[in-house]
């Protein structure tokens, strides 16, 4: 099965078969969208919450808000229906201890913005594994819409399928 790897501040979409994956989700978030009927899906690996807050600099996929809009547009182009899409959300970890500043709680903010934007777009969030301190790797199976998540927390490897 072909695997497409998504880097930080990037996304990929596909249809039918294959795996779309992203590695090393720390404070970043990985958002998957999937239409079970057409078997169209996509994955976004966003670094920061809102483009406007950073002066819309650079690639829109770097930000949760603009990246999600981009991902939505691309899965619809491949045949997905916005009304059937299901979202899954991963990442948003607090990677450093002793951070008190709200400004530096990027992981938490990424998760909040992702949930807000999904609500605004009318897309159902059906699964999530967010927060904590460990990094995550996720694999979206385009034939089923299932996401296999692997994380390391306190030296333990945890794998789950969502």
UniProtKB/Swiss-Prot annotation:
Its EC number is 3.5.1.44. Gene3D superfamilies: 3.30.1330.200. It catalyses: L-glutaminyl-[protein] + H2O = L-glutamyl-[protein] + NH4(+). Keywords: Chemotaxis, Hydrolase. Signal peptide: none annotated. It is an enzyme of class 3 (hydrolase). It comes from the Archaea. GO terms for biological process: chemotaxis. GO terms for molecular function: protein-glutamine glutaminase activity. The keyword Glycoprotein does not apply. Belongs to the CheD family. PANTHER family: CHEMORECEPTOR GLUTAMINE DEAMIDASE CHED-RELATED (PTHR35147:SF1). Probably deamidates glutamine residues to glutamate on methyl-accepting chemotaxis receptors (MCPs), playing an important role in chemotaxis. This is Probable chemoreceptor glutamine deamidase CheD. It comes from Pyrococcus horikoshii (strain ATCC 700860 / DSM 12428 / JCM 9974 / NBRC 100139 / OT-3). The lineage of its organism: Archaea, Methanobacteriati, Methanobacteriota, Thermococci, Thermococcales. The gene is cheD.
